Structures are given as C-alpha cells and as structure tokens.
Amino acid sequence: MKQTVILTLLAVASATLSVQAQGPQGLAAVSEDSAACLKCHKDLDPGIYQQWGESRHFRANVACYECHRSAKGEPDAFEHFGKFIATIVSPKDCAACHKREVDEFASSHHSKGGRILGSLDNRLAEVVEGNKGFKTEGFPEGNAASAVSGCWQCHGSVIKVLDDGKLDPATWPNTGIGRINPDGSEGSCSACHVRHSFSAEQARHPDNCGKCHMGPDHPQKEIYYESKHGIAFSAYKDKLNMGRPKWVVGEDYFLAPTCATCHMSATKDQPVTHDIGMRISWNNRPAISVRPEVADAKMGLPGKDVPWQQRRDNMIN
C-alpha cells in the first residue's frame, strides 16, 4: 500500500513538473468580466456553454470576454451591461494569444479568399446566378441568395455594419475563410476552428477542408475520398489519435493521412504551418497553372520569395 502511494505521488509530481516545463497554460482563473457573461449565457446559450466547457479555452480559463471584448468607437462595438463587446471575433482578436498562427495565416491565400468578391470571376458568377431577390438594408438592390449562402460562406463576405450598429444579414453570420472584417482584418479562424469547442480533432478532419474544397470547380474532397489516402482514412479514422495536442505523422499515427497531414501539420522535421501555400509547388487555379511564388508576387504576399523547390521539399519532409 505504501509503495502504491509513493508511486502515485511520484506520478503526480512528474506530471506537475511536465506542465510547468511547458510554460504558461493560460489564465489563473476565469476573469470577473467573463464570469458575468457566463452567469447569463450558460442558460441563454446552453449549447455554446457546453461546447466551450469541453474546449482547451475552458481549461486555460479563456472565456467570453477575452475573445469578444471591444472598445468604444470600433466599427462593430456595442455596449452590453456596461462593457463594449463585438459579436465578430476576427484574426486580430485571436492574435492576442496566437500571433504566430495569425501571421502565417495572413500570409496565405486562404486569408485572401474574400478578395475574389470584386473580381471579374465573381461578377460573371453573379450574372449567371441572376436572381437578386435577397434584399437587405445594406443591399437594397439585392443579392443572389445562392451567393450569400454559397460562395460567400467559403470565400467570405465583406461584413457590413448598419447605421444602428447591427450586422447586415446578407453578410453575417459568415465564417468564410477570407471574410473582410469591420476591423480591417482579412479572414476567419472559425472557418476551420469551429466555435466554441475549437477542437483539434475536428480541424484535422478531411470533411473540415471538404466544406469548401469540393464540387466541379475545386473537387479536392472527391479526389481525396476516391484515393488510397481517403480509403485508408475511412477505414482507420478511429485509430488516428486526431484529438492529441501533439500530432506527428509516423509518431502519433501512421495508418492514413488527412489533408492537414500533408499541407499543415507538424512532421518530425518541421512545425505546424497555417500558410498552406508553403507545401504546394503548383497553383492550379488559373487556366494555365503557375508556380506559387508567381501568384504570391501578384498578391503582394511574403511567399513571393519562397521558390517552389523549397515548398516541394517542405511537402516531402
């Protein structure tokens, strides 16, 4: 019995030292401001409350106010029980804790997805869609409902804040990956990290990417699931340890790759990246494929200085 107790204490001490060695794990406690939010919203929004309660944010005591706080004068800020908050959590907000990830994302084509809305491609699509029967205060001339609930949900919308401070329903809710936010930032972290659980397992799942990478003009999801990679994933997905904080192919799993495995996730030789272009050696979107550094140069992105050979090596490694 004494030996069991000693071993247990040693295990606890070892775990404690391990946590301490990893550095800060979050806030010491839920803030008073967030506690005030939770007091009401645990009953008003029980689903959101439960999702947050199962998240790593919960374990780090990062709650409502830490993400939704705003300041008087910001475009989408409104006063709520004496505090200024915003409904939209933009990459600028996430950068308070996740600066490296946001910087990488901002350098990627993902974050620029909303720029297509002003392009000739998009104008052509709007003409083809035709019906502009979805009229809102921000768009009295109307929009095609198929664009609002289709194209914009992947590429992102340009969020419009109405005169009364509310968000135009044609542009919000929206989690498009290239959303243009009221604070001027581009992108939406929740395109991949679905609120409010922000599950790593969910973000790594092929269906997460397949929400947008599917269909006749970008059929990556269909190609993946019909490939040996997709067949293996379907057979062994319960054995891939997709919820682990550390998720390195060849160490934590080996039976099948997901989209994230090759394009984003950590390997034995390189860290996670949120710039998906750093492992792609061709840009196949144009009618004639181009090297990614060419496309990056046109968009003014840092990747213009990263040759395709380096990106190919990143993918191989």
Region locations from a protein language model:
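Primarily the internal scaffold of c-type cytochrome electron-transfer domains
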Residues: 23-24, 47-62, 76-144, 157-317
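Bacterial N-terminal signal peptides
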Residues: 7-16
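Positively charged n-region of N-terminal signal peptides that target proteins for export
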Residues: 1-5
